[in-house]
């Protein structure tokens, strides 16, 4: 996490005197192009893409442009530098900026996913998998200090398994390179998001043995965040953005996965409709998405428990230092009280 913190702080220091290009793109009634930097690209984030595909963003005079940051540290760097208007990643990235003492901390204004969306993949079939099966094994866990790795370690500790004692967590492979490293022989297990996990298993390369999210419980896993200066200039856009995504969550929860899948095809080039539908259903089965895109204090505190357990938290924060639920609450009440 130290390298991630240093990277974020360096970017922050270098951009304090720069005015983001989006600064002149206030709420003036025209179509707003919103630059979104996402931590990775997955069906786990289907409501975001559906809000675009179903025209919900268009209804709010918003056009989105997506960039895959390949990690929360990169997403946060893009937000701090002004290269992205909205960062879409784990809130730990903003928490690290806060506890680092910065006065320019991005605000979390919406939470899409409420648990880990990865699945544990084994090289061999384990129909009766238990966490004790991991004893003596090596697992590709992701970037140290990132929520995926810390959540996984938290689950292991809950099952009395310790890294370096009972098993080995491999933090040496970049998040977006884990699957290819696993395929070429690194480690005994790997965590993967859908549709990658589904297609990996369908190709006979491995076996999904557990849902990490089901084991971890609810945590604020992936959130929308932006600099306060951007939110203040673009309140209508921020609210409209959440309105569109909230509508998309409602749609995906009320619609058969096979009906949803065709709308997502354009966002997952080379992925089959069958794979997308199966992934949507799997995420629905684990109750992955927030209906109201607010963050709860209980889940925020669990996130800090997870980070603290990993030895990566120098002090705890209060939720109101980092989170503004106002816009999410407003659009939820509009949509569900109509």
Where are these regions (language model features)?
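Bacterial N-terminal signal peptides that target proteins for export
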Residues: 1-11
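C-terminal motif of bacterial Sec signal peptides marking the signal peptidase cleavage site
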Residues: 20-23
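Bacterial signal peptide processing site
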Residues: 25-27
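Short, glycine-/small- and polar/acidic-enriched structural segments
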Residues: 29-162, 168-172, 188-194, 205, ...
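Stable alpha-helical elements in mature extracytoplasmic
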Residues: 44-47, 53, 72-75, 90-93, ...
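Pocket-lining segment of extracytoplasmic ligand-binding domains
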Residues: 176-268
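Secondary-structure end/capping motifs
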Residues: 232-315
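Conserved C-terminal helix/tail region of periplasmic/extracytoplasmic solute-binding proteins
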Residues: 301-338
């Amino acid at each position: 996490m130290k390298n991630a913190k240093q990277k974020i702080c360096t970017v922050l220091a270098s951009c304090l005197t720069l005015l983001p290009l989006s600064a002149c793109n206030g709420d003036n009634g025209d179509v707003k192009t919103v630059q979104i930097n996402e931590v990775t690209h997955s069906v786990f984030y289907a409501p975001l893409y559906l809000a675009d595909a179903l025209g919900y963003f268009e209804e709010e005079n918003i056009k989105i442009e997506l960039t895959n940051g390949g990690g929360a540290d990169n997403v946060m760097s893009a937000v701090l530098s002004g290269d992205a208007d909205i960062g879409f990643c784990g809130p730990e990235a903003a928490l690290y900026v806060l506890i680092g003492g910065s006065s320019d901390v991005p605000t979390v204004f919406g939470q899409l996913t409420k648990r880990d969306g990865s699945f544990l993949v084994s090289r061999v079939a384990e129909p009766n998998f238990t966490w004790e099966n991991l004893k003596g094994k090596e697992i590709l866990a992701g970037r140290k200090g990132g929520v995926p790795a810390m959540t996984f370690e938290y689950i292991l500790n809950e099952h009395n398994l310790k890294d370096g004692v009972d098993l080995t967590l491999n933090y040496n492979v970049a998040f977006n390179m884990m699957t290819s490293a696993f395929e070429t022989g690194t480690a005994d297990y790997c965590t993967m998001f859908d549709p990658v996990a589904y297609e990996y298993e369908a190709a006979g390369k491995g076996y999904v043995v557990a849902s990490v999210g089901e084991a971890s419980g609810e945590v604020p896993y992936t959130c929308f965040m932006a600099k306060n200066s951007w939110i203040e200039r673009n309140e209508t856009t921020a609210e409209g953005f959440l309105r569109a995504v909230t509508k998309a969550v409602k749609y995906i929860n009320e619609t058969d996965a096979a009906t949803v899948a065709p709308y997502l095809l354009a966002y997952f080039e080379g992925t089959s409709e069958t794979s997308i539908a199966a992934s949507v259903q799997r995420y629905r089965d684990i109750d992955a998405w927030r209906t109201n895109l607010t963050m709860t204090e209980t889940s925020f505190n669990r996130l800090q428990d997870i980070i603290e357990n990993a030895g990566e938290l120098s002090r705890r924060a209060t939720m109101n230092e980092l989170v503004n639920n106002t816009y999410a609450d407003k659009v939820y009440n509009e949509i569900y009280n109509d």
